[in-house]
């Protein structure tokens, strides 16, 4: 911390960490404080898993699924960055998703039960979908026509027009979405593509996008 933060701000951070831990039935077991020019919060989580679902299991013929539509956090960032007034519930939701991301842990747990491979997409579908494809030795074909069928697509597209950023950039390259990407057969989630022979990620009926956040380049 910088030493300039007021006590209530610090307490709000502590309350937020405690609440998120409570949702997962986890315990906060320690920590330390140091002074720096900017506030940095670093958290390490430990746990046990009987049968991990990794990025390595995707097979040709699998389908590709999302736990929920991505792009809302990037939409919220652009609304804030451009200083726009929030004119709809959808815009309020987008800003909330950027400022305080929500994670559907139940969806993640259910996905992992039947998925052949799985990852989060907080750096973007383009980057982490590509990483999953590389780990599994396959190609992910992401289909824009499938994504358009999501019931929230039209609302997100309206925001994209207002902020002047292509909706596909928000969905595929935006990042900061706390959603899950998985491969498998007949998963009860939103299908966005298929697994085919090849490598990397291919966008079908989706214009070129900037890939998103790369920790080793940005």
Predicted regions and their residues:
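Glycine-rich anion-binding loops of enzyme active sites
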Residues: 1-81, 194
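Active-site glycine-rich loop that binds ribose-phosphate moieties when present
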Residues: 44-54, 90-110, 163
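Short hydrophobic/aromatic beta-strand micro-patches
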Residues: 46, 181-185
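Short, surface-exposed beta-edge/turn micro-motifs
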Residues: 62-63, 177-180
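A structural signal for short secondary-structure junctions
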Residues: 163, 172-176, 185, 196-197
């Amino acid at each position: 911390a910088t030493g300039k933060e007021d006590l209530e701000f610090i307490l709000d951070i502590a309350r937020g960490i405690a609440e998120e831990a409570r949702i997962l039935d986890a315990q906060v077991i320690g920590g330390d404080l140091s002074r720096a020019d900017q506030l940095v919060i670093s958290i390490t989580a430990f746990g046990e898993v009987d049968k991990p679902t990794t990025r390595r299991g995707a097979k040709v013929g699998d389908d590709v699924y999302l736990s929920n539509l991505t792009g809302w956090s990037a939409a919220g960032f652009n609304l804030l960055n451009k200083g726009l007034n929030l004119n709809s519930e959808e815009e309020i939701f987008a800003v909330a998703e950027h400022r305080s991301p929500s994670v559907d842990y139940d969806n993640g747990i259910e996905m992992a039960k039947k998925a052949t491979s799985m990852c989060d997409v907080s750096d973007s579908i383009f980057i982490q979908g590509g990483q999953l494809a590389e780990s599994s030795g396959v190609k992910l074909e992401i289909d824009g026509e499938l994504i358009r069928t999501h019931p929230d697509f039209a609302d997100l597209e309206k925001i994209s027009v207002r902020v002047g950023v292509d909706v596909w950039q928000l969905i595929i390259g935006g990042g900061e979405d706390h959603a899950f990407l998985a491969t498998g057969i007949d998963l009860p989630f939103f299908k966005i593509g298929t697994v085919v022979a090849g490598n990397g990620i291919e966008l079908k009926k989706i214009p070129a996008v900037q890939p998103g956040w790369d920790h080793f380049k940005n």
